[in-house]
Regions:
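Conserved active-site segment immediately N-terminal to the catalytic lysine
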Residues: 151-162, 177-185, 196-215, 245, ...
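Structural detector of well-ordered beta-strand residues that form the stable sheet scaffold
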Residues: 50, 75, 96, 149-150, ...
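PLP-dependent aminotransferase-like
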Residues: 64-160
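N-terminal "arm"/small-domain region of PLP-dependent enzymes with the aminotransferase-like
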Residues: 1-26, 255-257
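Glycine-biased, low-complexity coil/linker segments
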Residues: 170-172, 192-196
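Phosphate-binding glycine-rich loop
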Residues: 26-73, 86-91, 97-98
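Active-site PLP attachment segment
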Residues: 199-242, 267
């Protein structure tokens, strides 16, 4: 059986977990937490990173930092995981669902402005499959209407958004990435590819769930790009206390000063993640090779109109988080998944439309979201993981060709 996903282990995880266990500091915010946070801040340019126990927790922290009050409106795509909405619903927000683009599951930035009212407070673009949304358009709207932007970058670690940042002045060196390499990171420096996904909005939430490119079993991270929110974020992260200030020597004791929760992960989780971070570029290189093999082998079928392949906009890079194709009907997708399963290959569909979910359908305003519904009915995800081989990909593509009678 070729599974849909298989977690990749670098071989360093147990070594670092052992090191964490013997450090005398297991409860979190120790050496491995700091290594990971420093790495992400220096590699991508975030103002502040805080590891969390899940991406859901990172989104919930963002919702608190956005000061969501009952009745505030938050615009999100309907084609997303429930955590995107749930984090804001828990704070009392009313969710306003936006449709996807016709050719991509990402939110249609051209349809957002019509949804903005005097109660709108936040826009939450979701970078589906690691492909960035049209952030220039979204940030222009945020500035125009004084809104906050939370990037749901759960799938988008090591993705980039264009246009490219300004080049360093002549004679100067851009050290954003070389600094990261000094943090015990032996991987090569990635090429400059624009702004990192998650660095553009006020906040971004990342996932290190076992299905993601780099993993810690469960785990996430809140990235903060606006310095106004860093101080309060540390308090919320530490159960509503000013504990971080105490350990920096800024106060002589700490106490309960704000709302919050136990969002920080243990050092065991952070140690596992650090082993993955050290191999980030190697993991990315392999996944991209597999992604391009899929694309090259399936493009002739897509050119015949048998299905639709992922569309990559000119302003975004591909981090090879996922390879999917879009069938022309629900029945066709069901038949394709069955054909693959009959050949010991596990392919899966993805999200159901949140606007028609049992929990929220009676709260939705009734607008039709046809593009979202199309992806909910027709999108199928193919196996993608580090240990997948090119021969595996070729076999999968051969079965797909058999299904469409092109062999």
């Amino acid at each position: 059986m070729i599974p849909f996903n298989k977690p990749y282990l670098t071989g360093k995880e147990t070594h670092y977990i052992y090191e964490a266990v013997n450090s005398g500091k297991l409860s979190g915010n120790g050496i491995f937490t700091k290594r990971c946070q420093d790495f992400f801040e220096q590699r991508y340019g975030f103002k502040k990173c805080l590891l969390t126990t899940s991406c859901t927790d990172a989104l919930e922290m963002a919702a608190i930092l956005c000061d969501i009050q009952p009745g505030d409106e938050v615009i999100i795509p309907s084609y997303t995981f429930v955590s995107t909405a749930l984090a804001f619903v828990r704070q009392g927000a009313r969710i306003v669902f936006a449709d996807s683009m016709p050719n991509h599951p990402n939110i249609d930035a051209d349809k957002i402005e019509a949804l903005i009212t005097d109660r709108t407070k936040v826009i939450v673009p979701v970078h589906y499959a690691g492909v960035a949304c049209d952030m220039d358009k979204i940030m222009t709207l945020a500035t125009k209407y004084n809104l906050l932007v939370v990037e749901d970058a759960a799938q988008a670690i090591d993705s980039y958004y264009s246009p490219l940042p300004p080049s360093p002045l002549k004679g100067e060196q851009d050290t954003r990435y070389t600094n990261a390499l000094q943090l015990n990171n032996p991987t090569k420096t990635p090429p400059l590819g624009g702004r990192g996904a998650g660095t553009i909005g006020h906040f971004a939430a990342f996932s290190f769930h076992e299905t993601k490119n780099i993993i810690s079993g469960e785990g996430g991270m809140l990235a903060i790009n606006d310095e106004r929110f860093i101080h309060r974020a540390e308090i919320i992260w530490e159960k509503g206390t000013n504990r971080a200030e105490f350990f920096r020597g800024e106060v002589n004791k700490y106490g309960w000063v704000d709302t919050g929760s136990s969002f920080l992960p243990s050092e065991v989780i952070a140690a596992f993640l650090w082993a993955q971070v050290e191999h980030l570029d190697m993991i990315q290189d392999k996944r991209k090779q597999l992604w391009h093999t899929y694309y090259e082998l399936l493009k002739p079928l897509a050119d015949k109109g048998l299905f639709i392949l992922p569309d990559l906009p000119s302003y975004a890079t591909n981090n090879a988080h996922m390879f999917y194709l879009v069938c022309h009907s629900l029945d066709e997708r069901t038949a394709l998944i069955k054909k693959l399963k009959d050949n010991d290959i596990l392919a899966v569909f993805h999200y159901l439309s949140l606007h028609s979910s049992p929990y929220y359908n009676n709260k939705h305003d009734g607008r039709k979201l046809p593009n979202c519904d199309k992806f909910a009915d027709c999108l199928v995800r193919l196996p993608m993981y580090y240990d997948l081989t090119k021969d595996d990909v070729k076999l999968i593509c051969e079965v797909i060709k058999m299904k469409f009678n092109t062999i």
